[in-house]
């Protein structure tokens, strides 16, 4: 069975590398400008009067490789923006501005125009301003194009959503993803291009081409989630990206997140699993599996969350609940994420 590690990505090694880097960052300002206590969360924040200024930075990873193969660059900028703004809203912040960074080996005016169009589409959907950026020509360092960005967001101090209020009895509402989003592309490319020898124009069994599926842009959840925060007491917010539902542990680590009512898995994930003979657990550790964002609320508020999502043309479902502990293999587990799928119970650690 093929794994994400076989495709060159070891998420556990990445976790160790990040911890090694973070362990060396010891300096903090000694004046009144203090960072928020959000270590390990989706975004960093620093005090600014009655507000927190929130910063997120991210790129599109190897999705750009597929864009180069298909010579189609107008959707990956949307992915870059989505990866940033979707992280920012996880603490209840409203994204307001973006700066981008593009590193190129060489680039044509046509590719630049496509990227510009995608940037405009992404900032429009996110309701943010693109206020600056940097383009670096690095022919001796990289091949192709790499695109990343940093988003600034703001939130009132007393309106931050940290996830610490998540408690047993709350429910998890999952918002439908548009597809693969921007994570797991290395494994998807290995399955489609190395194992099965398809190309970007090959049709998959459900009718779409490989390029159409892999270049579908990441869903931007800014507008519906900000509306949810205004209308409902939202306890926790989680952008489901690399690592899948493990991301829920960024919220309250003292509870169990039980995912046991998943909707139908999207066709792209079935294709990857079937063609690559990928195990269920590996799929859920690598991909969003059709749920791109989670909203945790009290049970009586779930219907309103679903209503708001549907108003923004996003299907939403109650996919699980918060519990003190879960049972698996005759053992009691605490402080974990349990996914039940295909008559299996899987711990996401």
From Swiss-Prot:
List the keywords (alphabetical).
ATP-binding, Cytoplasm, Ligase, Nucleotide-binding, Purine biosynthesis
Under the heading SUPFAM superfamilies, the entry gives:
PurM C-terminal domain-like, PurM N-terminal domain-like
Q: Does the keyword RNA-binding apply?
A: no
Subcellular localization, per the record? Cytoplasm
> What's an example GO cellular component term for this entry?
cytosol
GO molecular function, a single term: ATP binding
Question: Per the record, what are the reactions this protein catalyses?
Answer: 2-formamido-N(1)-(5-O-phospho-beta-D-ribosyl)acetamidine + ATP = 5-amino-1-(5-phospho-beta-D-ribosyl)imidazole + ADP + phosphate + H(+)
- Tell me, which GO biological process terms does this entry list? 'de novo' IMP biosynthetic process; adenine biosynthetic process
Coiled coil regions in record: none
Record-linked Gene3D superfamilies: PurM-like C-terminal domain (3.90.650.10), PurM-like, N-terminal domain (3.30.1330.10)
What pathway, per the record? Purine metabolism; IMP biosynthesis via de novo pathway; 5-amino-1-(5-phospho-D-ribosyl)imidazole from N(2)-formyl-N(1)-(5-phospho-D-ribosyl)glycinamide: step 2/2
Which InterPro entries does the UniProt record give? PurM-like_C_dom (IPR010918), PurM-like_C_sf (IPR036676), PurM-like_N (IPR016188), PurM-like_N_sf (IPR036921), PurM_cligase (IPR004733)
In short, the EC number is 6.3.3.1
Database matches in Pfam families: AIRS, AIRS_C
Q: Which family does it belong to?
A: Belongs to the AIR synthase family.
Cited NCBIfam families: purM
Q: Which HAMAP family match?
A: AIRS (MF_00741)
User: What protein am I looking at?
Assistant: Phosphoribosylformylglycinamidine cyclo-ligase
- The organism named in the record is Methanococcus maripaludis (strain C6 / ATCC BAA-1332)
The major lineage groups are: Archaea, Methanobacteriati, Methanobacteriota, Methanomada group, Methanococci
Q: Which gene holds the coding sequence for this protein?
A: purM
